[in-house]
């Protein structure tokens, strides 16, 4: 009744530490990670979203 690799339809994924190599094959990062890829970048700015940057003052770096 369930998948022998991932135990679907069980709620949690099937994983065993006695097979380290198998874990490595299917851990996070072996796929696209559509969502997780961008998390570190968003974490750096405290997950701020949809705000506009404050306007810089006129003669900041150009006056050298």
From Swiss-Prot:
GO terms for cellular component: cytosolic large ribosomal subunit. Zn(2+) binds at residues 3, 6. Keywords: Metal-binding, Ribonucleoprotein, Ribosomal protein, RNA-binding, rRNA-binding, Zinc, Zinc-finger. A zinc finger (C4-type) spans 1-6. It holds the Pfam family Ribosomal_L37e. GO terms for biological process: translation. InterPro entries: Ribosomal_eL37 (IPR001569), Ribosomal_eL37/eL43 (IPR011331), Ribosomal_zn-bd (IPR011332). Belongs to the eukaryotic ribosomal protein eL37 family. This is Large ribosomal subunit protein eL37. It comes from Solanum lycopersicum (Tomato). The gene is RPL37.
């Amino acid at each position: 009744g369930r998948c022998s690799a991932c135990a679907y339809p069980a709620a949690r994924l099937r994983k065993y530490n006695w097979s380290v190599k198998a874990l490595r094959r299917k851990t996070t990062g072996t796929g696209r990670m559509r969502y997780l890829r961008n998390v570190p970048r968003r974490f750096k700015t405290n997950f701020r979203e949809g705000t506009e940057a404050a306007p810089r003052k006129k003669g900041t770096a150009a006056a050298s």
